[in-house]
Amino acid sequence: EWEEWLLA
């Protein structure tokens, strides 16, 4: 994904 670090 990409939001893994966004909403980490």
Swiss-Prot record:
It is a peripheral membrane protein. The keyword Membrane applies. GO terms for biological process: protein transport. Keywords: Cytoplasm, Endosome, Lysosome, Membrane, Protein transport, Transport. GO terms for cellular component: late endosome membrane; lysosomal membrane. It is found in: Cytoplasm; Lysosome membrane; Late endosome membrane. Homooligomer. May play a role in clustering and fusion of late endosomes and lysosomes. This is Vam6-like protein. It comes from Mus musculus (Mouse). The lineage of its organism: Eukaryota, Metazoa, Chordata, Craniata, Vertebrata.
